[in-house]
């Protein structure tokens, strides 16, 4: 039987599933030496861990071998695209395409397609850094796919 997949917001996930993701991260980052320790630190039973471990994955884990397309709404200032690309490059992303609109009324839209193969941080961390840039008014993921 073919399995179906859904992209679901974190705030509607059951607490047990969120804790399984936490336990998996603890194991991946070597903060826990065993499943038993990770389950204990995440405050779940080993049974819950084993029940859901192969069924839930953070979005960034699914995008490890993908192209991610990001949309930005930026203030039109000198050097903004350069700073934006520096943050993306520092995360280990390889920029594949750039599309920038002509600035109108002091604003410009930029769409970046990046390869996340060599990315060394979570996509959420990268998005937080990008949102922290003072000239970024909006950033969102508009697509992702395997190439």
Curated annotation (Swiss-Prot):
Disulfide bonds: none
Family matches, as PROSITE patterns: ACT
Domain of life where this protein originates: Bacteria
Pfam families per UniProt: ACT
Sequence ranges assigned to domain ACT in this UniProt record: 69-144
Family: Belongs to the UPF0735 family.
Name the UniProt record assigns to this protein: UPF0735 ACT domain-containing protein GTNG_2535
Species annotation: Geobacillus thermodenitrificans (strain NG80-2)
Taxonomic lineage from the root: Bacteria, Bacillati, Bacillota, Bacilli, Bacillales
């Amino acid at each position: 039987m073919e399995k179906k997949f859904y992209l679901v917001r974190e705030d509607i996930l059951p607490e047990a599933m969120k804790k399984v993701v936490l336990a998996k991260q603890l194991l991946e980052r070597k903060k826990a030496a065993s499943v038993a320790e990770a389950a204990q630190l995440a405050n779940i039973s080993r049974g819950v861990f084993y029940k859901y471990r192969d069924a839930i994955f953070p979005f960034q884990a699914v995008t490890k071998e993908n192209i991610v397309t990001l949309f930005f709404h930026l203030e039109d200032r000198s050097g903004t695209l350069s700073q934006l690309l520096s943050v993306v490059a520092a995360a280990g992303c390889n920029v594949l395409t750039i599309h920038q609109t002509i600035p109108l009324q002091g604003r410009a839209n930029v769409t970046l397609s990046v390869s996340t193969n060599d990315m060394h941080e979570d996509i959420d961390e990268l998005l937080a850094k990008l949102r922290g840039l003072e000239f970024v008014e909006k950033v969102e993921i508009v697509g992702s796919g395997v190439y």
